[in-house]
């Protein structure tokens, strides 16, 4: 079998659990083929690395990296760390039956709450997201010390929910910020040119902040 040595199971047999990941290979291949043959590139959205590298000079690029690490980084880090923490602290509970609910809620809340940022503003929503995360963290600590798994899981589900809201709100902030910053930083650009430049920088910042925030999957489980 591919993927390494087998693991023993309870019945005394062998299990190649690591091979379960190969179930995604056909879907990845199909998606890649559909993208290659079916998607159309937008010509005016192309930008070289040199053109995109201007974002490293933008203060708000680094600020958004920090904020998005707090939201998406927390989401992906909690997804990796929650089962480990729950299993260590509540060994008598079959945590795998329940912990999947938290990331599911976070994923749904990201998709379902984007309108909130559009209506009230991404910055305002992000502020309250971090307040909610602080409240959720205190709740987790409280129920962890009390040995209450139900309360512990409920607080984590709440934190996943607000991180999902924050994932949407921080991304909503990026184009808004750049549409304001580019005309100020590059006054020589006319209206349409400034808009295109803001769109290019926004797209680059979205990609870069996502890459940085993904490190949450590494350092949050390490904290446990």
Segments predicted by a language model, with ranges:
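C-terminal membrane-cytosol helix-exit motif in multi-pass small-molecule transporters
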Residues: 24-45
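Juxtamembrane intracellular "pre-TM" segments in multi-pass secondary transporters
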Residues: 40-65
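Extracytoplasmic gate region of multi-pass secondary transporters
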Residues: 58-107, 167, 171-172, 220-221
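Cytoplasmic membrane-interface "Motif A"-like loop-to-helix N-cap segments
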Residues: 118-131
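C-terminal ends and interior cores of transmembrane alpha-helices
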Residues: 131-147
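Hydrophobic core of transmembrane alpha-helices in multi-pass small-molecule transporters
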Residues: 150-167
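Intracellular juxtamembrane helix-capping segments at the cytosolic ends
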Residues: 165-193
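A late C-terminal transmembrane helix in Major Facilitator Superfamily
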Residues: 188-224
